[in-house]
Amino acid sequence: MVDSVGFAEAWRAQFPDSEPPRMELRSVGDIEQELERCKASIRRLEQEVNQERFRMIYLQTLLAKEKKSYDRQRWGFRRAAQPPDGAAEPRASAPRPPPAPADGADPAPVEESEARPDGEGSPSKGRSASARRPAAAASADRDDRGPPTSVAALRSNFEKIRKGPAQPGSADAEKPFYVNVEFHHERGLVKVNDKEVSDRISSLGSQAMQMERKKSQQSAGQGLGEAPRPHYRGRSSESSCGLDGDYEDAELNPRFLKDNLINANGGNRPPWPPLEYQPYQSIYVGGMMVEGEGKSPLLRSQSTSEQEKRLTWPRRSYSPRSFEDSGGGYTPDCSSNENLTSSEEDFSSGQSSRVSPSPTTYRMFRDKSRSPSQNSQQSFDSSSPPTPQCQKRHRQCQVVVSEATIVGVRKTGQIWPSDGDSTFQGEADSSFGTPPGYGCAADQAEEQRRHQDGLPYIDDSPSSSPHLSSKGRGSLASGALDPTKVSELDLEKGLEMRKWVLSGILASEETYLSHLEALLLPMKPLKAAATTSQPVLTSQQIETIFFKVPELYEIHKEFYDGLFPRVQQWSHQQRVGDLFQKLASQLGVYRAFVDNYGVAMETAEKCCQANAQFAEISENLRARSNKDVKDSTTKNSLETLLYKPVDRVTRSTLVLHDLLKHTPSSHPDHSLLQDALRISQNFLSSINEEITPRRQSMTVKKGEHRQLLKDSFMVELVEGARKLRHIFLFTDLLLCTKLKKQSGGKTQQYDCKWYIPLTDLSFQMVDELEALPNIPLVPDEELDALKIKISQIKSDIQREKRANKGSKVMERLRKKLSEQESLLLLMSPSMAFRVHSRNGKSYTFLISSDYERAEWRESIREQQKKCFKSFSLTSVELQMLTNSCVKLQTVHHIPLTINKEDDESPGLYGFLHVIVHSATGFKQSSNLYCTLEVDSFGYFVNKAKTRVYRDTTEPNWNEEFEIELEGSQTLRILCYEKCYNKMKMTKEDGESADKLMGKGQVQLDPQTLQDRDWQRTVIDMNGIEVKLSVKFTSREFSLKRMPSRKQTGVFGVKIAVVTKRERSKVPYIVRQCVEEIERRGMEEVGIYRVSGVATDIQALKAAFDVNNKDVSVMMSEMDVNAIAGTLKLYFRELPEPLFTDEFYPNFAEGIALSDPVAKESCMLNLLLSLPEANLLTFLFLLDHLKRVAEKETVNKMSLHNLATVFGPTLLRPSEKESKLPANPSQPITMTDSWSLEVMSQVQVLLYFLQLEAIPAPDSKRQSILFSTEV
């Protein structure tokens, strides 16, 4: 007998109220039989549940019909006007549900005969608005004219059968009742209330269905299965009934309402121009129509003034994916019904709960909607009738309509506040004569909309930008629209600025149109290929990927064509507001595009993976970059171009803010632009209400959300190897992921490496560190070699840009640069950040900045206060969470300079002088010091440290530091308390034992710092304030060696002059500084690298210049770093470098030789050729630096570190003007060549430091022998 281990225990744990079933499982055959019985039972129970649900929904709808007030607000309707007493008769018969389907068979599709997309019958076949429904006799006459040729005609005949002999004008005319009808995909209507229809009706239906199939075969888009996709909509070629050919029933054709009810001013509207393509169709649902005497059902109680009232309609769900069997139909949406049980909610999750755009007219006509966040039953998101939908089952439903409506509003968020008056708010837009826009909304069920999660967050604030873009946009003042501010400006200047703003908008529109053209370019050949035997993509895929792109192009082309001549013929009274207002009114097309964006990206990715030809096409889309140059194009990917409309719609408010800022309130355009701005802002707000919670969270349990708090790239130490990771901090866990390698056309994907619930996470303390491995440090020589390569590649890229050579060379260089920068980012960090899990596992990250490490610690600890329970994720949950990271991430690129946009600031190159004055705000006396960090090559580096100010709450350091900047944009300052008591140490992560008291940062703005004056600033650190002064000197000015004006001094005087005056071989200042450093500075950490106090250095400089006899006493009392700084300053201020201007180019060429023998001969020959004073001083310093490097284990100064510090100081030539670029607007070229030169200087000095023996100066004559070897 097979042992069913653990089944009974698991059953009781899951179902404590019932005993586990007994199963006799003696063999594999018994198990299979039991499994089949279980499956059969499930099928039977599912059928019974579905039947009962159908009955429940039917009873709900019937109850809603009988009780007109039942759940009215959830349906989204206003109160229906009640018919006069006696005007209605009881219905002849109650509706019945269709017979239950047989086991295993699909149920017959059930719809009302009217429930067809209006695009599937000819709209022109219905009567025009002027023709009201005649008496029944007239309808009978119409039957004799021949077979009907459209669904509308078929519907009219069915209405006649349904109504019987009732006269339309009589007060007791029978109301339309609800019937059960059955459709056949070939014969049309076949049953009414379970009774077979007559042969005549059946033949009419067969003819109508044949006509629909013929039309659907000619249409561009094809639906799923046998269902025709919505096709071209406009005037039918068979039409003989006027221009518009509207249906006679208002419910069946929204345009009937638009043209006949909404024309508030009584004028005739121009005919709609035909749309090229309309993917969504209005579908008649059926409804409770109240007929009056001689009036159309919807107009019975409406007076002339009532026609102007804004009208409402229930939200409808149109899912292109649900039209599988019956060729389309209304699919009720129950995903947001709050009164369903949990099982009902499961049942209501069908295909149509996905994105279902519905038709809409002008967004101007929309009524006030409600935000889904309000969870109100009056929300339009909850307004669907409580009817289930199923993949292959279409149910009838009832709609109680109180007033005529324009269209179903499928949207959340407020378009504009309703003021409650009865005036029609769409008049300003009624003269445009453009077809209706389209709006679409998203259902709230997250699991049904995973394909929509790819949408970036859209911020409607004027100073913000979407997710993917890191470009800074100038923020606009909040009072930009204040007329008092505008009035203060010079009117003439403001109007002139208005023209320039419009010119900028024109240029932007031109670029945007070129991007849309680039998208449309491959669409036509792809569509043509779709009909061949070897299609690249199917028609459905093409429609999904390029959805709404043609409409967007037409909208913006019309806008551009209207704006261009007005700007060309400019005057201060020129009006453009109507164009912007019209553009804003068509934002509904963007709504449809944005809602489809996630599906389009997902489809494109799948197509790229499945078809190499399409992958190639999607990576090489050409957009015109210059209108004046024919062949000037730029290459873009499909992903980039598809994001352009999303990015574009977020900027709609920005241009309007700019335009309004320079438009006087008295100008005719002002009110129109304000209206356009209001529409745009409300549109973006409505999108935000839906996207924000979806983007920032991932559903954990019902009512709970896991939100992303912080993420960044880090280096993880895994068994001694460095690995690049992307770390995500959620509200309840820390997730470590690895970015997968990307191939052409693919989007980012992550692999989960590990996760720790925040309740299980801790930071390691000092007593736990003994068993932890040491951090493998990368030698500085390797890091500098990487920097040399990076600088060389950047220089090559700049040269290629100037030469305008082929893009292949540029792409190859960019790839090499990315690889080298990634390697540098991986090798540079050395500061440990360790996290420990309760299960005993530890993980180590390497960070280059203590500031960043402190930020992560603070964020994790703050969130841990809100977490109380541990948990574990299933593999499916973990995979879903990892997949969501692609959409949720805020850091999209590895922090490399290659990822910077061309218009981003390259940062500052030069020297930053910083004075750390004082700090206030400490609550108790402490031993305090500060450190300074700046960013370089994409990561932050610690550059300087103040002395410790003991036992004080208000330290006054007043220390000055000179920090070299290499593309730096940010200065960070961190304030610590020095811990001398070992019992007090926390020593987290095995690093500094000192306590971080506060941290802050200041942006290094090139505009502010260019004047080379001191800038005072105060940095706030949560109550602690640190006062700083900063001054920047660019490399252009720091390159020059300035000779001293007085020849009696030491600084700035030629070394030969000083040694001759002192009658010594080595200058006194060099000997004194070296002796003092060797006496007490050999074990000083960072000697020569840590900056000394600037005031002490200046004091020593002055003492040496005046030949003060007490200088040795002064030095003994000063910090050793100040003495080291004085020695460096002396060599830096020599009017000619120690290696002389004459020999510097030869040294640079000699170090580049590849043959080691030739290199040694050349370098020694050049060295021994230096003037005697220069040579002896250099050899004296060289011996000292070698002795410093011998203490490397203590002072952390290797030969390479020393070469980095002294290389530029000893070799940098005095005259550099000829090598500087003439155009200062090319900072990258200058800084790259500078970096290469600095690296070369470092290499020259490092070569001599690494030589074991150098010939004595008195062997100078041997240079002849060396030269012969070369």
UniProtKB/Swiss-Prot annotation:
Modified residues (Phosphotyrosine): 178, 247, 553, 643
Deleted gene: phenotype: Mutant mice show impaired spatial and object recognition memory with reduced maintenance of long-term potentiation (LTP) in Schaffer collateral-CA1 pyramidal neuron synapses.
Modification Phosphothreonine occurs at: 387, 640, 692
Keyword Coiled coil: yes
Keywords for the protein's UniProt record, in alphabetical order: Acetylation, ATP-binding, Cell projection, Coiled coil, GTPase activation, Guanine-nucleotide releasing factor, Kinase, Methylation, Nucleotide-binding, Phosphoprotein, Proto-oncogene, Serine/threonine-protein kinase, Synapse, Transferase
Rho-GAP domain ranges (all copies): 1053-1247
Chain positions with Phosphoserine modification: 122, 139, 203, 216, 237, 358, 379, 384, 461, 465, 475, 487, 1263
Subunit: Homotetramer. Interacts with PDZK1. Interacts with HCK, FES/FPS, ABL1, PIK3R1 and GRB2. May interact with CCPG1. Interacts with SH2D5. Interacts with DLG4.
Modification Omega-N-methylarginine, positions: 473
UniProt protein name: Breakpoint cluster region protein
Its biological purpose: Protein with a unique structure having two opposing regulatory activities toward small GTP-binding proteins. The C-terminus is a GTPase-activating protein (GAP) domain which stimulates GTP hydrolysis by RAC1, RAC2 and CDC42. Accelerates the intrinsic rate of GTP hydrolysis of RAC1 or CDC42, leading to down-regulation of the active GTP-bound form. The central Dbl homology (DH) domain functions as guanine nucleotide exchange factor (GEF) that modulates the GTPases CDC42, RHOA and RAC1. Promotes the conversion of CDC42, RHOA and RAC1 from the GDP-bound to the GTP-bound form.
